């Protein structure tokens, strides 16, 4: 059956695959017949992701992408890829007056530096095919809107969006596309562990035109579109997935 949105048989590396959007993206890609390389820092949670994936031939590699040695090992152990989903991320609620060099370095390293270096080393080692697709997880925060306490997170994600545009230009002659997804608030287990109460979360959802947060699979579907040949003329873009929040 003709399906330009198919990713069947594509080899795709997903980082941050042990939870949240990364986990869901890996599972959804496997349902569509892709062959996954999944990575994350927590072996037990990564193993759970692997157990929920469909099909066979998937590879699990435990790695801490804030460590250059782990990045190099991951690249060496990866097969030649059709796609990369740079999804690993970190947030810390803090306002400007409480920023420290150490706190800023930590969040920038995880959200910005590590995914950039992973991409760069995959390119250098010729581990991405011509016609390949790279998707970075960015955010509406910092790019389209801001929020109290998001100063470091917004900065790191705005930097990712800037990198995506420049890298797309650099890679165009090689036939490699570079895009980003920019989600609004998404229902993940991170919210289960937050200090924000249910009533506060319900009130916050009312700020969204659709009166709810997004689901991880709704972001995964956007990522799959950008990985597929249906987006073959799309590069340097940020796909906003926010239930209309930034329209207000």
Feature locations, PLM:
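Short C-terminal tail/terminal secondary-structure segment
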Residues: 2-3, 224, 235-248
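Conserved glycine-rich cofactor-binding loop
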Residues: 18-20
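Substrate-binding pocket helix/loop in short-chain dehydrogenase/reductase
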Residues: 95-96, 103-105, 204
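Alpha-helical segment proximal to the catalytic Tyr-Lys
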Residues: 124, 169-170, 232
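Short, small/polar-rich loop/turn modules that mediate ligand/substrate recognition or access, typified
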Residues: 172, 177, 234-236
């Amino acid at each position: 059956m003709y399906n330009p949105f198919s990713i069947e048989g594509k080899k795709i590396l997903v980082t941050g695959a042990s939870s949240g959007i990364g986990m869901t993206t890996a599972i959804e890609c496997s349902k569509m017949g892709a062959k996954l390389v999944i990575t994350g820092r927590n072996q037990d949670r990564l193993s759970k992701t692997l157990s929920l994936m469909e099909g066979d031939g998937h590879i699990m590699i435990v790695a801490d992408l804030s460590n250059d040695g782990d990045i190099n090992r991951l690249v060496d152990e990866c097969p030649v890829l059709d796609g990369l989903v740079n999804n690993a991320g970190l947030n810390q609620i803090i306002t400007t007056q409480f920023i420290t060099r150490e706190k800023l370095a930590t969040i920038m390293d995880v959200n910005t530096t590590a995914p950039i270096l992973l991409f760069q080393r995959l390119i250098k080692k010729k581990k991405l095919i011509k016609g390949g697709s790279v998707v970075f997880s960015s955010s509406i925060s910092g790019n389209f809107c801001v929020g109290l306490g998001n100063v470091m997170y917004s900065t790191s994600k705005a930097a990712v969006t800037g990198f995506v545009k420049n890298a797309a230009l650099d890679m165009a002659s090689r036939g490699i596309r570079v895009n980003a997804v920019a989600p609004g608030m998404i229902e993940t287990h991170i919210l289960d562990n937050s200090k924000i109460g249910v009533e506060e979360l319900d009130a916050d959802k009312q700020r969204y035109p659709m009166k709810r947060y997004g689901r991880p699979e709704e972001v995964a579907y956007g990522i799959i579109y950008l990985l597929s040949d249906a987006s073959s003329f799309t590069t340097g873009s940020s796909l906003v997935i926010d239930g209309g929040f930034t329209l207000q």
